[in-house]
Amino acid sequence: MADHASKIKDIIEKELGVEREKLTPEASFIEDLGADSLDIVELVMEFEKEFNIDIPDEDAEKLRTVGDAVAYLEAKVGG
């Protein structure tokens, strides 16, 4: 659902301080958006807070791109 994708991108944009245009599905958090491991932890915490879900560490490790995050969160929250 576009609404979830928009919220996810809002969180990424705010947490990483990157322009929205860079938030393509294939954009890697680390290689393309300049995130480090702490940034990833903070992103996951914000996703959990925004969507009121728990993201296990083993799932969080699989969230490498914007598209990964959107697909995972939409599946998790029924989007």
Curated annotation (Swiss-Prot):
Record field: transmembrane: none
Superkingdom classification of source: Bacteria
SUPFAM superfamilies: ACP-like
PROSITE patterns linked to this entry: CARRIER (PS50075), PHOSPHOPANTETHEINE (PS00012)
One GO cellular component term: membrane
Alphabetized GO MF terms: acyl binding; acyl carrier activity
Localisation: Cytoplasm
Biological processes, Gene Ontology terms: lipid A biosynthetic process
Pfam families tied to this protein: PP-binding (PF00550)
Post-translational modification: 4'-phosphopantetheine is transferred from CoA to a specific serine of apo-ACP by AcpS. This modification is essential for activity because fatty acids are bound in thioester linkage to the sulfhydryl of the prosthetic group.
Entry keywords, A to Z: Cytoplasm, Fatty acid biosynthesis, Fatty acid metabolism, Lipid biosynthesis, Lipid metabolism, Phosphopantetheine, Phosphoprotein
Keyword Iron: no
Primary role: Carrier of the growing fatty acid chain in fatty acid biosynthesis.
HAMAP family per UniProt: Acyl_carrier
Family, as annotated: Belongs to the acyl carrier protein (ACP) family.
Name the UniProt record assigns to this protein: Acyl carrier protein
Lineage: Bacteria, Pseudomonadati, Gemmatimonadota, Gemmatimonadia, Gemmatimonadales
Gene, per the UniProt record: acpP
